[in-house]
Amino acid sequence: MPDWLLTLLITVVKAVAVILALLTTFAYMTLVERKLLGRFQIRVGPNRVGPMGLLQPAADAIKSIFKEDLQVTLADKLVYTLAPIIAIGMALTAFGGIPAGPEGSLFGENPWVYNLDAGVLALLALTSMGVYGIFLGGWASGSKYPMLGGLRSSAQMISYELGMGLSILGLLMLVGSTRFTDIVLWQGANGWMILFQSLGFALFLISSFAETNRTPFDLVEAEQELVAGYLTEYSAIKWALFQMAEYVNMITASALMSTLFFGGWRGPGFLNGIIPGIADIPILWLVVKIGFFLFVFIWVRATLPRLRYDQLMRFGWKLLLPLALFNTMLVAGYIAFFSSWGWWPLALLSLLGLTALLALSDTVRQLWNAPMTRRETELPPVPTRSAGGD
């Protein structure tokens, strides 16, 4: 067999394995989320299908596949059908660039589907392209509420993609590479990036909630305002594909935070002194870290209320973006003037930046609780007709 064909075959097998793992995780993430939300709200959660409700994801999948697929008369049928495929396709493709271990650690093969020189930039580009599926789905539905949800998704992505990119710019300046494997190896030699970029991590975490359209930034499908946003006119398997894309994006965002700030596949080194070799099991530690951040996503959903749309935009442009620029300037100043002092000045500067963010809590609260704009508060009253007629 030619080498190129063998390489292609191995890549296809790894891609299929990643897709199956993501879809299985998505299925049981829905169950875990409903169970945890039930605990948070002092109720039981799904417990009827199978032992302890463990077969609920299978029941949901069968229901989605065999439900009637309704379609609005005015919908653009081609785009309406392609939109969920684009959303899930971008989500699945993005995760393939996350390394699950060092080179050659997967039965002699590399534990990733692709490892580009510009891996971080490529993954951010792929995750941001998922918004095309949401916008096109809203536009092609032929209804006003999905269209509003699609427009919100575009504005939200533009606002928070800038903050997300700038929040990791300092990290990339320190490492000097955009390859995920180089970033993990750098952390193995110098310590987890969270020690030196705590402010950058806080900003990236907030941006991740907005990028994945999760509470408190789930404005694109706000039930109280837009019925279900871009999902209003979708049903059956097309609706399930959009839900699948959302959860896969959550998994990808969790893997990104684990890789960029928490050492990726590496476990805490001090554990080797307790149980020899326990910190050197690559895939195990990546899965544990991803699971932790998925719990954070669910925890925040159960805790925080949804923002208003004007609060969402104000928070992104007036607070998140300036702080991300400030963090980048801190790292640039460290590299220019203090790099010969070691890593402790950078850790101190990052901690001071995070303290400044906490010190701005009053400003954050003002942005959060700001009144609506003048135009919104001074809308003319809606004329009414008397019930008795003329």
Curated annotation (Swiss-Prot):
This protein's GO CC annotations: plasma membrane
Keyword list, A-Z: Cell membrane, Membrane, NAD, Quinone, Translocase, Transmembrane, Transmembrane helix, Ubiquinone
Enzyme nomenclature, EC number: 7.1.1.-
An MF annotation (GO) of this entry: quinone binding
Keyword Translocase on entry: yes
Compartment list: Cell membrane
UniProt membrane topology term: Multi-pass membrane protein
TM spans (from-to): 4-24, 78-98, 120-140, 157-177, 191-211, 247-266, 278-298, 315-337, 341-360
Reactions accelerated catalytically: a quinone + NADH + 5 H(+)(in) = a quinol + NAD(+) + 4 H(+)(out)
Annotated S-S bridges: none
GO terms, biological process: aerobic respiration
Keyword NAD in record: yes
Subunit structure of this chain's protein: NDH-1 is composed of 15 different subunits. Subunits NuoA, H, J, K, L, M, N constitute the membrane sector of the complex.
Family according to the record: Belongs to the complex I subunit 1 family.
Annotated PANTHER family: NADH DEHYDROGENASE SUBUNIT 1 (PTHR11432), NADH-UBIQUINONE OXIDOREDUCTASE CHAIN 1 (PTHR11432:SF3)
Role noted for this protein: NDH-1 shuttles electrons from NADH, via FMN and iron-sulfur (Fe-S) centers, to quinones in the respiratory chain. The immediate electron acceptor for the enzyme in this species is believed to be ubiquinone. Couples the redox reaction to proton translocation (for every two electrons transferred, four hydrogen ions are translocated across the cytoplasmic membrane), and thus conserves the redox energy in a proton gradient. This subunit may bind ubiquinone.
The protein, known as: NADH-quinone oxidoreductase subunit H
